């Protein structure tokens, strides 16, 4: 398969249609992806159809990033069908014309708080209110803490209450919050407001 890819890239008389058909017959998604990335004459529709059928999310993602022509709507739907939050997240980083809303809903449906956190930290578009509502359901306090460090919008009061609820599992992350400037400043403001309210009542 490596030889077919090299020949399709360098030999002027190479039959690219037959070459792609042979790569598809051999069933290697990496080589179909490489052919689409390097061949000057490539049937992108057939290449995508082959990658989709092979069901390898990594090379669907890579094709969406590097191929000159790629149906990103269909590509995202295939990643969602494959239930792979990692490559849905990666596609949001690197694909042009990406449907962030559709991808976010997929991450929520998959229930993967790790990649909801990563999306909130790194995607160009993200629904922070809905994302926080999903994040706060988790018992994985690491991602609640990290989101407070990196998300542009974050409800520190609700997050802190969540970390207090998990007395033992949240202990490490409450300690880290005190050591992190953004968390520390947010908590100071929250407690100052609470003390002012208590003072006004007394």
Give residue spans per PLM region:
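Ankyrin repeat (ANK) tandem alpha-helical domains that serve as protein-protein interaction scaffolds
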Residues: 1-202
């Amino acid at each position: 398969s490596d030889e077919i890819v090299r020949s399709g890239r360098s030999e002027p008389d190479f039959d690219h249609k037959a070459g792609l058909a042979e790569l598809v017959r051999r069933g290697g998604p990496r080589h179909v992806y490489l052919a689409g990335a390097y061949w000057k004459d490539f049937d992108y529709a057939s290449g995508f159809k082959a990658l989709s059928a092979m069901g390898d999310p990594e090379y669907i993602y890579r094709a969406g990033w590097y191929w000159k022509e790629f149906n990103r709507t269909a590509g995202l739907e295939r990643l969602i069908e494959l239930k792979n939050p990692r490559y849905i997240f990666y596609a949001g980083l690197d694909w042009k014309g990406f449907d962030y809303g559709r991808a976010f809903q997929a991450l929520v449906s998959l229930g993967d708080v790790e990649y909801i956190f990563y999306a909130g930290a790194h995607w160009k578009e993200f629904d922070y209110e809905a994302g926080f509502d999903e994040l706060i359901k988790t018992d994985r306090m690491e991602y609640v803490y990290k989101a407070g460090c990196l998300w542009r919008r974050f409800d520190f009061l609700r997050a802190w209450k969540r970390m207090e609820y998990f007395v033992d599992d949240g202990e490490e992350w409450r300690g880290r919050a005190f050591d992190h400037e953004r968390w520390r400043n947010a908590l100071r403001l929250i407690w100052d407001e609470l003390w002012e309210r208590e003072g006004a009542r007394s």
